[in-house]
């Protein structure tokens, strides 16, 4: 919604409301941020200072943007006041008040709740006797390390103190290999507890459901309060199915016997329901086990319609039977005594688990206090403690904060938890209420962060029925999307989302209302289902893929290819995107598109397919950081530095570019020793090969292994004596690996990843954690927990398709949205664990009988699983809502099916529902979002082609949604692929051979002849460069008579001849590919020049001072020891004992060393170009030195070459020195009087005329 838009009545109400609490339910695209900013502006204009408002945002970025928008609005208001009344000055009260708000904006309480809590603690730390000197753990890594360290200590203590009981606890949640299962559970339980206002109290209540004492099971509080409602719901569901079966049978006039059977079954269910609250467990178990439905007539001869209706009726009846079987196997699998025995044993386990968690909680807090650190959870708990402590200081602090804030404003209210709610409620006033809460519970998708959308829902219902508690206003207008996106969203969610299954009623108030006034009425409005079929009766044998070398062997590839082809089709359209800013249609841009994925599993496939279609793409977190090649290699190397006797990481390093062995060479090593571990085989080869028969192949392997083992020994020594960060950086430097990955595809990203590993090691050691073994172990734990290192920022192409998770898309919008992988199965991991957690239901565990070693599900686990499953489905619905409402103009729902007939047959179960909302059974039975969407659209008239002989009980005849279904399979997708390649990449030879006949007049013919016969007058210059270094062109001066090019090259020679640039004949191998460490003469020469440059000329130059200079360069790691020891110290001393050297030492202020220069000279002096060529070449270089004397400038150039005669230096380098002299002459005309080459090995000067 643009800022200039007139506010709707509901928006005006939100902006103007005051005098009570206000809950704003803001649907997607309803302009809630704009409304929130305007509400703040109204309060400022009414006299409230901005620091009198507490504005809580969900992220730091949101807070930053809000401040920026407020600053912009305040400045606009100031400009408006001065424009409306030019006589008004900046000293006027209104403008002065607004300028004051700009000054206060920097200290305004517009931030996340964590940031606000930090300010409260820093202000009122004395209330709870907190040491004010603390550090915030902004990096989660250090917190995890401390947590692991503390738990290791607590666990050892529990093993010693609790003995058998703790052993039973460990066995219940771990396995024979490790007790990591218990560790993970302790941490999960701790995190859950920390999200509540009273962690200790919440933990203490966890064993209560297992408390049955001596009373009957069905009389226990657990049964009556938690299990009974679930059983009633199950029976109610079966009765509803039977009523639907009875209605079908009655309407179709089926045989009376059928109606009798159904009535009997219904009566049995009614009796069961009545007895659920009062009968004993064993009585209920018997009734459930013996429930039966009599035989029903399924076919009616010569009456196909009755047969069809009987089939529909049978579907309902089969559903009842299946549900009753599940009830028997899930709830009533054991008799009462068995259940009680299991509950008693499980209670002791849960009690011990709670005690262990409390001990860990206490020890963790103590360790953080000892280290003077706090984490984000501490901020909220300490703030709550400050506000609720039973002392005068606490009461005074609370009173001050309440008095300070005229209003408490909470953005994204649906994503807070009960702890945060407690803090906000304390800060708010009671009479009148001053809380402003805005959000959309339909977009609450952060359950994994322990957000609690039920808090929003409770207030929504409470304010609706008790207006004295607060007001509620719904912002239903969607100003983001075209009408059809709203229609499809309403069509789907009005059938899917209700309180029993989705936690929320998607009623008329929740419907998206079309808000924009600027979209053209004739704008295309179709939304699409893109369905890739994996099994059809078509064959791919007739499709030639030779041109593409491409096949589809993965359903994900098929659906992604369909999307790529759709994007290309959009690209080919003439201006398909409407630009609302200027009211015109414009061409399609790749950045108009976002692909929303449920997980990152197929991101690499997206990159691969899109690359094939030349579609630029930006993928956030294309793969897990730990799975990138460079990080896996580094982690493998660190692992074997810690312990080389690990086959997998060892082979990974040997195969990597650091060593460079190929598969055959790895096999060759293993053949040398087939029985021992691989490192022993490597060592055996290294020690035995030199004494055996040598081969060229073996020599190659030996050279690499020798280098590797040398480096490994050095690295292991470094690891013992240095920090991890030093080790990692030395690995980068000595192997050249950091430079190597920079040359790989996405090199900058890979280098950033390696730098991130270095930074992570630095953070690790800053937290007082030491040791390579512990660091490697920590990284492995991070991988096991699916915790990633800080993502390194990669460069992105702004003009590219965006790929992101649905969570990552929240708050964003794009003209074209593809919701991907809708057939992905819901994640059931949380329901399969041996311990299920829920804030309300508590904990449900699987119990391991210590005698029989058999695991039994407990009834609290059954209850908790139902609660967790319901919340999971509700969150999946909300994720789908978020994904669909990101679309502005075009929306595509993408999924994979077996074939359309099979899919629509499954989706037609929606026909049995009598009302708009689909039956709970059908929605709960769905295993992915595509089935939800399929059932919801199935009753729409657009899908009539797939109805077959069936007809929905409730038809959506008046729904305005425009829907299209596009089907694809391997045949059609490959065919379109072939056409796309043929269209966009025609064969070059084919184009050349095309015969084109045209008529041209003589004038055109003469003009074309002139063009074809044109000769560029500076053709020779196109084969030269405009930039050269002295070292590159020095050969031209060795023999000026030697032509660089043939005088009259042939056409073929012109085509094949490279550009004239004089360079060295080869490039140095990277360090990790070198097999020797011996310094080259060039390296020694460069080092000698460096020493000559660094010598202090104000002191005597002798062997001691020269060696001291060399030692200093080695100490500073400018020179290596291997190079330094080869520098001829005596030759340097000899230079300064010469006449010129003595003159230099006598006038150190007059000598200039290592002087860089640039010089423009005519190209014809260097290259074989036309003498009339006027182009010039830029020469750059560095002059070794020159001395200012009374007679002029004396130029000298050191040489370390070993030559037979000094004159050879003159032959080789005279031209180079002449260039130096020309450069000096251009700076000091007429002053260069002497030019010398000095041979350091022969200790003689060679004059250059």
From Swiss-Prot:
The keyword S-adenosyl-L-methionine does not apply. Belongs to the helicase family. AddA subfamily. It catalyses: Couples ATP hydrolysis with the unwinding of duplex DNA by translocating in the 3'-5' direction; ATP + H2O = ADP + phosphate + H(+). The gene is addA. ATP binds at residues 26-33. The heterodimer acts as both an ATP-dependent DNA helicase and an ATP-dependent, dual-direction single-stranded exonuclease. Recognizes the chi site generating a DNA molecule suitable for the initiation of homologous recombination. The AddA nuclease domain is required for chi fragment generation; this subunit has the helicase and 3' -> 5' nuclease activities. Keywords: ATP-binding, DNA damage, DNA repair, DNA-binding, Exonuclease, Helicase, Hydrolase, Isomerase, Nuclease, Nucleotide-binding. It holds the Pfam family UvrD-helicase. One of its GO terms (biological process) is double-strand break repair via homologous recombination. Residues 521-811 form the UvrD-like helicase C-terminal domain. Residues 5-482 form the UvrD-like helicase ATP-binding domain. NCBIfam families: addA_Gpos. GO terms for cellular component: cytosol; DNA helicase complex. Transmembrane segments: none annotated. The lineage of its organism: Bacteria, Bacillati, Bacillota, Bacilli, Lactobacillales. This is ATP-dependent helicase/nuclease subunit A. GO terms for molecular function: 3'-5' DNA helicase activity; 3'-5' exonuclease activity; ATP binding; ATP hydrolysis activity; double-stranded DNA binding. InterPro entries: AddA, DNA_helicase_UvrD-like_C, DNA_helicase_UvrD/REP, P-loop_NTPase, PDDEXK-like_dom_sf, PDDEXK_AddAB-type, Restrct_endonuc-II-like, UvrD-like_ATP-bd. Its EC number is 3.1.-.-, 5.6.2.4. Its cofactor is Mg(2+). The keyword Hydrolase applies. Heterodimer of AddA and AddB/RexB.
């Amino acid at each position: 919604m643009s800022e200039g838009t007139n506010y709707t009545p509901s928006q005006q109400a939100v902006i103007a409301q005051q005098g009570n609490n206000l809950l704003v339910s803001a649907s997607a695209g309803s302009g809630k941020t704009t409304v929130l900013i305007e509400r703040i502006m109204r309060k400022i204009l009414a006299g409230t200072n901005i620091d009198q408002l507490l504005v809580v945002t969900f992220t730091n970025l949101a807070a930053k943007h809000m401040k920026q928008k407020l600053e912009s609005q305040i400045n606009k208001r100031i400009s408006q006041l001065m424009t409306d009344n030019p006589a008004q000055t900046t000293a006027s009260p209104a403008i002065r008040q607004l300028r004051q708000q700009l000054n206060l904006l920097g200290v305004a309480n517009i931030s996340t709740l964590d940031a606000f809590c930090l300010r409260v603690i820093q202000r009122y730390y004395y209330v709870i006797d907190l040491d004010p000197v603390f550090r915030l753990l902004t990096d989660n890594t250090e917190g995890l390390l401390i947590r692991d360290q503390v738990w290791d200590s607590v666990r050892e203590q529990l093993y010693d103190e609790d003995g058998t009981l703790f052993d039973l606890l460990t066995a219940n949640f771990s396995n024979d290999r490790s007790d990591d299962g218990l560790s993970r559970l302790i941490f999960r339980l701790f995190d859950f507890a920390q999200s509540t206002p009273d962690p200790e109290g919440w933990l203490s209540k966890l064993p209560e459901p297992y408390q049955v004492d001596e009373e009957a099971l069905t009389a226990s509080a657990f049964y009556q309060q938690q299990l009974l409602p679930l059983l009633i719901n199950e029976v109610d569901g079966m009765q509803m199915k039977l009523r639907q079966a009875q209605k079908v049978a009655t309407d179709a006039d089926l045989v009376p016997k059928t109606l009798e059977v159904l009535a009997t079954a219904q009566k049995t269910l009614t009796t069961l329901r009545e007895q659920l609250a009062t009968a004993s467990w064993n009585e209920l178990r018997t009734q459930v086990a013996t429930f039966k439905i009599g035989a029903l007539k399924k076919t009616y001869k010569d009456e196909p319609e009755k047969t069809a209706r009987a089939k529909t009726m049978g579907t309902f009846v089969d559903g009842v039977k299946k549900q009753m079987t599940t009830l028997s196997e899930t709830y009533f699998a054991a008799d009462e005594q068995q259940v009680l025995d299991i509950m008693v044993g499980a209670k002791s386990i849960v009690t011990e688990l709670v005690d262990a968690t409390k001990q860990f909680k206490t020890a963790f807090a103590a360790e953080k206090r000892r280290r003077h650190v706090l984490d984000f959870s501490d901020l909220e708990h300490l703030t709550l403690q400050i506000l609720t402590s039973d002392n005068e200081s606490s009461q005074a602090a609370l009173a001050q904060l309440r008095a300070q804030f005229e209003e408490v404003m909470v953005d994204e209210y649906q994503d807070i938890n009960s702890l945060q709610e407690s803090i906000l409620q304390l800060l708010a006033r009671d009479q009148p209420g001053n809380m402003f809460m805005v959000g959309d519970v339909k977009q609450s998708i952060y359950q994994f962060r322990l957000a609690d959308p039920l808090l929003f829902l409770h207030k929504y219902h409470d304010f609706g029925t008790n207006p004295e508690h607060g007001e509620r206003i719904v912002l239903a207008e969607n100003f983001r999307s075209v009408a059809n996106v709203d229609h499809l969203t309403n069509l789907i969610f009005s059938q899917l989302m209700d309180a029993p299954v989705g936690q929320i009623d998607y009623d008329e108030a929740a419907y998206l209302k079309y808000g924009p006034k600027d979209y053209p009425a004739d704008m295309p409005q179709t939304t699409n289902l893109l369905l890739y079929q994996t099994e059809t009766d078509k064959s791919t044998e007739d499709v030639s893929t030779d041109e593409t070398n491409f096949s589809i062997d993965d359903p994900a590839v098929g659906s992604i290819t369909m999307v790529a082809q759709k994007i290309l089709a959009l690209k080919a359209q003439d201006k398909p995107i409407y630009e609302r800013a200027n009211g015109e249609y414009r061409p399609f841009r790749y950045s108009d598109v976002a692909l929303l994925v449920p997980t990152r599993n197929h991101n690499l496939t997206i990159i691969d397919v899109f690359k094939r279609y030349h579609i630029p793409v930006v993928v956030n977190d294309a793969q897990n950081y730990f799975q990138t090649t460079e990080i896996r290699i580094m982690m493998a190397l660190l692992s074997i530095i810690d312990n080389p006797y690990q086959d997998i990481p060892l082979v990974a390093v040997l195969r990597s570019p650091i060593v460079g062995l190929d598969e055959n060479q790895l096999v060759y090593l293993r053949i040398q020793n087939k029985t021992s571990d691989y490192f022993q085989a490597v060592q055996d080869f290294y020690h035995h090969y030199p004494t055996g028969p040598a081969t060229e192949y073996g020599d190659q392997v030996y050279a690499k292994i020798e280098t590797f083992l040398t480096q490994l020994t050095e690295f292991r020594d470094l690891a013992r004596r240095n920090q991890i960060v030093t080790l990692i950086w030395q690995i980068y430097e000595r192997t050249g690996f950091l430079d190597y990955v920079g040359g790989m595809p996405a090199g900058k990203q890979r280098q950033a990843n390696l730098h991130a590993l270095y930074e992570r090691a630095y953070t690790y050691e800053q937290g007082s954690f030491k040791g390579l073994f512990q660091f490697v172990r920590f990284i492995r734990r991070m991988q096991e927990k699916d915790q990633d290192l800080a993502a390194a920022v990669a460069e992105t192409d702004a003009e590219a398709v965006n790929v992101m998770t649905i969570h990552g898309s929240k708050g964003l919008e794009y003209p074209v949205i593809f919701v991907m992988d809708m057939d992905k199965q819901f994640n059931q991991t949380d329901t399969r664990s041996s311990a299920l957690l829920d804030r309300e239901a508590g904990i449900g565990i699987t119990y391991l009988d210590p005698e029989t070693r058999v695991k039994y599900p407990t009834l609290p686990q059954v209850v908790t699983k139902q609660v967790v499953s319901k919340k999971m489905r509700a969150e999946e619905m909300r994720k789908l809502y978020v994904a669909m409402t990101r679309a502005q103009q075009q929306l595509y729902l993408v999924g994979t099916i077996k074939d359309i007939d099979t899919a629509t047959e499954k989706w037609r179960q929606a026909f049995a529902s009598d009302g708009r909302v689909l039956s709970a059974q059908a929605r709960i039975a769905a295993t992915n979002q595509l089935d939800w969407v399929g059932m919801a659209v199935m009753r729409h008239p657009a899908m009539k082609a797939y109805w077959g002989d069936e007809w929905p009980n409730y038809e959506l005849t008046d729904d305005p949604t425009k829907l299209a279904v596009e089907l694809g399979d391997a045949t059609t997708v490959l065919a379109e692929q072939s056409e796309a390649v043929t269209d966009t990449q025609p064969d070059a030879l084919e184009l050349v051979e095309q015969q084109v006949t045209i008529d041209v007049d003589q004038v055109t013919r003469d003009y074309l002849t002139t063009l074809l016969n044109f000769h560029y007058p500076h053709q020779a210059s196109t084969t030269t460069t405009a930039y050269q270094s002295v070292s590159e062109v020095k050969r031209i001066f060795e023999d000026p008579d030697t032509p660089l090019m043939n005088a009259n090259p042939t056409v073929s020679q012109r085509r094949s001849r490279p550009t004239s640039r004089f360079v060295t004949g080869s490039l140095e191998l990277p360090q990790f590919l070198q097999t020797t460490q011996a310094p080259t003469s060039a390296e020694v020469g460069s080092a000698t020049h460096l020493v000559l440059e660094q010598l202090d000329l104000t002191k005597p130059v002798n062997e001691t001072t020269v060696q001291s200079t060399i030692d200093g360069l080695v100490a500073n790691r400018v020179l290596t020891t291997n190079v330094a020891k080869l520098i001829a110290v005596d030759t340097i001393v000899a230079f300064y004992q010469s006449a010129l050297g003595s003159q230099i030492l006598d006038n150190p202020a007059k000598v200039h060393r290592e002087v860089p220069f640039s010089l423009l000279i005519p190209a014809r002096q260097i290259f074989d170009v036309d003498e009339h060529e006027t182009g010039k070449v830029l020469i750059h270089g560095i002059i070794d030195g020159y001395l200012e004397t009374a007679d002029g400038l004396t130029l000298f150039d050191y040489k370390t070459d070993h030559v037979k005669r000094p004159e050879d230096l003159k032959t080789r380098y005279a031209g180079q020195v002449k260039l130096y002299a020309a450069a000096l002459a251009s700076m000091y005309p007429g002053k260069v009087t002497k030019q010398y080459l000095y041979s350091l090995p022969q200790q003689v000067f060679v004059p250059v005329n």
